[in-house]
C-alpha cells in the first residue's frame, strides 16, 4: 500500500479507505466536520491570518480519529508526540495515511457500535475529565479584537437585548498590559473586579484567557520569578528557549517540572 504515497516519513502507516468513509476528530482543525479530502499537521500553531481550509495546523493537536461508515464505526489513536501528518484521502481516494518525523509507530484501534462507544474507549486510554460546572457547557462568546471593557459589555448587552442565550464572555489578550500574562490593562479595561461584577449582574461568567508565552522583560514580575526559579523551558544546550509570540520575544514555562505546575496552580488560584 505504501507505493505511490508521497508522504515518505520515518514513521508511517497507510490504510485502505472505503468510498463511504467519513473522518471526525483531530482537535482544532480547519474545514468541515467531516475531514475526508483534507490533510493536516499535528504541530500547534497560532496563525494570525484568516483560518482558511489551506491551513494544516491550528492551536490544538489531538491525533485521534473517529471513522464512520454506513455499517460501522471505529477510532484510531496515534500515540506519538512528534510532529506528525494526516492525509485523509486528499492525495488519493484509495487510502489515508498517518506519518511522523520520529518516535514509535504505536496506535490503538478502538472498536464499538456507536460514536459514544468510541469516545468512551479513547477516554479509557487517556483519562477522563471530571464533569464540569453546568455553565461551562453553555454558549461562550469569544473573539480577539475587543479593545475595551465597554466593547465587551456592549456585546454582552446585545445578547440580552435580543434574548439570545449566552453564559460566558471571554476576555482575549487585549485585557492584558502589553500582552503580559497575569496583568490587567486598567487604561482600557478599568477595575477588573468592577468590570467582572457588571457582567455577573447580567448573568454572565467571565473568562480571561492566559497565553503560554511569558514576555522576556526584566523587571516584569512573572519573568523575573521564572528566571529565579528556573521555571522556563530550555534548549538542548541548556539556554532558556526564546521565541516570539504576541508580546514579542517570550519564554515558556516548563510544565514538565512539578515545581512549575505547582507555581501555575498557585497563580491561577490567587
Predicted feature locations:
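Catalytic and substrate-binding clefts that recognize carbohydrates or anionic sugar/phosphate headgroups
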Residues: 1-133, 143-144, 149, 156-161
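Aromatic-lined carbohydrate-binding/catalytic grooves of carbohydrate-active enzymes
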Residues: 130-270
Amino acid at each position: 500500500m505504501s507505493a505511490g504515497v508521497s508522504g515518505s516519513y520515518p514513521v508511517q502507516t497507510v490504510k485502505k479507505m472505503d468510498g463511504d468513509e467519513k473522518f471526525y476528530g483531530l482537535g482544532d482543525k480547519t474545514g468541515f466536520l467531516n475531514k475526508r479530502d483534507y490533510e493536516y499537521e499535528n504541530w500547534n500553531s497560532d496563525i494570525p491570518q484568516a483560518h482558511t481550509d489551506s491551513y494544516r495546523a491550528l492551536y490544538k493537536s489531538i491525533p485521534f480519529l473517529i471513522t464512520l461508515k454506513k455499517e460501522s464505526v471505529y477510532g484510531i489513536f496515534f500515540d506519538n508526540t512528534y510532529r506528525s501528518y494526516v492525509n485523509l484521502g486528499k492525495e488519493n481516494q484509495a487510502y489515508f495515511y498517518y506519518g511522523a518525523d520520529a518516535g514509535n509507530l504505536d496506535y490503538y484501534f478502538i472498536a464499538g457500535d456507536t460514536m459514544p462507544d468510541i469516545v468512551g474507549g479513547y477516554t479509557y486510554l487517556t483519562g477522563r475529565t471530571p464533569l464540569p460546572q453546568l455553565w461551562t457547557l453553555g454558549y461562550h462568546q469569544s473573539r480577539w479584537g475587543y479593545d475595551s471593557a465597554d466593547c465587551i459589555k456592549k456585546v454582552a448587552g446585545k445578547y440580552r437585548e435580543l434574548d439570545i442565550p449566552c453564559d460566558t464572555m471571554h476576555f482575549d489578550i487585549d485585557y492584558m498590559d502589553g500582552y503580559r500574562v497575569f496583568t490587567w490593562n486598567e487604561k482600557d479595561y478599568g477595575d477588573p473586579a468592577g468590570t467582572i461584577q457588571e457582567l455577573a449582574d447580567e448573568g454572565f461568567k467571565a473568562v480571561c484567557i492566559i497565553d503560554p508565552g511569558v514576555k522576556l522583560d526584566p523587571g516584569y514580575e512573572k519573568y523575573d520569578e521564572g528566571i529565579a526559579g528556573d521555571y522556563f523551558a530550555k534548549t538542548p544546550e541548556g539556554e532558556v528557549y526564546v521565541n516570539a509570540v504576541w508580546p514579542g520575544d517570550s519564554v515558556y514555562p516548563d510544565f514538565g517540572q512539578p515545581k512549575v505546575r505547582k507555581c501555575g496552580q498557585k497563580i491561577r488560584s490567587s
